[in-house]
């Protein structure tokens, strides 16, 4: 969540990795719902003058999450046709570099959609079941401007090539993935 003052200066209000889904601002505070990397949707409050002051108001998922393995997304960046592409990996519990693991590639719909570090229940389930779960924002995804998103005339081409390059990159980074 960013704030823009009257001079055009932009500053972070909340700088934590994840996704802020809804918010309201009043009386120098923001109230918002967010998914962080390892915490499902909850309600938070933060003072606008202190980006590090976010306080969790609800604990709706604490009982559900208690005692469960929650993987922290590991960020990766690779190059594809002149673009820096962001992707993430969730590793299984007690990941052992000497063992082999099955893997699952998750591809978002759209193509005009986007992944982030935000908590993802389906990828957490896969990691908890012993899979290396990996996903990226290929060309055609949102959040990087029109030129990145525009794959008109190459739908199923550029995005496919990008996802396959990401898969090759992850297989290089994680030789523990069983082929």
Segments and roles (model prediction):
Residues 1:
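Terminal RNA-binding accessory module
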Residues 4-5, 47:
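Structural recognition of the beta-propeller blade-terminating site
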Residues 9-14:
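A short beta-strand motif characteristic of beta-propeller blades
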Residues 17:
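Anion-binding and metal-coordination hotspots
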Residues 21-179:
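Serine-hydrolase catalytic core recognition
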